[in-house]
């Protein structure tokens, strides 16, 4: 399934590919690997949807292409960013998959939305704060109870594919922006500390 021009914030659009073909999934993973093996830190958004809770054993509703296991365990070129991902990690583990424990970031633990005093900020809160207000309503596009029963079926309805794509993009883009701001602040602090050093930077 190829969904072109899925609307996100402003005039931005996503080009989304959803497949149940293992060979196509492996090609996509290979393409990602080629793109991320560069000089700069690379982040990959991760989110896991589950099969129906009322039809045990519940497991990750994911395909297991041959490249997925080493992709999740890779430790040099990229870091996975997710949101409240302890449940996702456990569900992946029960399906025989595991993310490298040294290469993932739980955004919910690393970032707080300023001036919003609640215990746990949602992805919608964070993405709405750092990307665009559009994302504040992203979770309202599906029925959190009934639609979550559909993740284990094939083919998935288009609106759930769109939802999953927006969710993954919001996770990735949120952390990329947060990390970019953090790096900029650290660089500015370092320059300020060495402002009077004529040899700094050489």
Positions of PLM-derived features:
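N-terminal accessory regions of nucleic-acid-interacting proteins
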Residues: 1-44, 107, 173-176, 183-202
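Short His-Asn-centered micro-motif
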Residues: 46-48, 66, 81-85
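Short active-site loop/helix that positions an aromatic residue
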Residues: 54, 88-96
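Acidic, Mg2+-coordinating catalytic module of metal-dependent nucleases/exonucleases
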Residues: 128-201
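Short acidic, Gly/Ser-rich segments with clustered Asp/Glu that frequently serve as metal-coordination loops
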Residues: 43-44, 48-57
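Short active-site oxyanion
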Residues: 75-80
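A short alpha->loop->secondary-structure connector
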Residues: 95-104
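Short alpha-helix plus adjacent loop in nuclease-associated cores
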Residues: 107-128
């Amino acid at each position: 399934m190829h969904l072109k021009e899925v609307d996100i914030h402003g005039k931005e659009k996503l080009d989304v590919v959803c497949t149940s073909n293992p060979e196509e999934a492996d090609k996509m993973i290979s393409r990602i690997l080629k793109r991320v093996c560069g000089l700069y830190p690379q982040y990959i958004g991760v989110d896991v949807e589950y099969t129906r809770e009322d039809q045990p054993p519940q497991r990750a509703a994911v395909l297991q292409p041959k490249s997925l296991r080493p992709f999740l365990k890779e430790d040099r070129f990229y870091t996975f960013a997710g949101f409240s991902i302890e449940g996702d990690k456990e569900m992946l583990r029960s399906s025989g998959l595991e993310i490298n424990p040294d290469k993932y970031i739980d955004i919910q633990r690393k970032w707080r939305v300023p001036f919003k005093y609640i215990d746990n900020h949602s992805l919608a809160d964070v993405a709405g704060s750092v990307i665009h207000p559009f994302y504040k309503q992203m979770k309202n596009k599906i029925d959190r109870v009934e639609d979550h029963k559909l993740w284990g079926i094939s083919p998935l309805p288009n609106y759930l594919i769109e939802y999953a794509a927006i969710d993954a993009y919001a996770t990735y883009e949120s952390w990329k922006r947060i990390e970019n701001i953090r790096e900029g602040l650290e660089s500015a602090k370092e320059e300020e500390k060495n402002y009077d050093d004529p040899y700094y930077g050489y």
